[in-house]
Amino acid sequence: MINSFRLLKDRKSKKGFSLLEILLVLGAIAALIVAAFMIFPKVQASQRIDRESRNLTAIQAGVKSLYGGRAKISSINTDSFIASKNAPENMIQDGKLINEWKGNVQVEYSGNHGKYNIIYDAVPASDCSKLIAAVSGNFVSIDVYNGNGGTQVKNLEEGKNIDIAATSAACFSEDNSTIIFASVI
């Protein structure tokens, strides 16, 4: 027993980390980095959709604030909307309305019964159907235009509620989409 105690006492303790321990830590760090790069784009896309759905709601509220109670809204356009200070400030860049994907946003009269359009340019295919699904309840009609042509995915005036399959098909394109959201005052 004394000999075994002396052997333990004489033995010098090793300082530092072994190669195996270092490789284990590096492997764990690499796994965390890979996981972060897989999750981060999804979180970013979700945040873009959330911001744009809030922007669309703010544009609608601004138009209603500006033109609510008026029988005639034919003077509505993007420039007058921005000048009225009803446009979301986070969208105004160089006197234009710009969306999260750096596309133009236009507000215009659609020509009938107090109806106006909010036009979103440069919406990527990966976010197109998600944006439409997030805000479809706020609009009477929604149209998607891209390299595949144009598709109406909702028209309450014709009794056509949102068609998710048609939305996915319309948004599936190598080109960015232009989405026209129609609303009524």
Can you describe what each PLM-predicted range is?
Residues 20-22, 29-46:
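C-terminal juxtamembrane segment of a hydrophobic transmembrane alpha-helix
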Residues 12, 39, 118-121:
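Short, flexible active-site loop motifs that bind/organize anionic cofactors or intermediates
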Residues 41-83:
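Membrane-proximal N-terminal amphipathic helix
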Residues 68-185:
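Periplasmic/extracellular, small/polar-rich flexible segments of pilin-like filament-forming proteins
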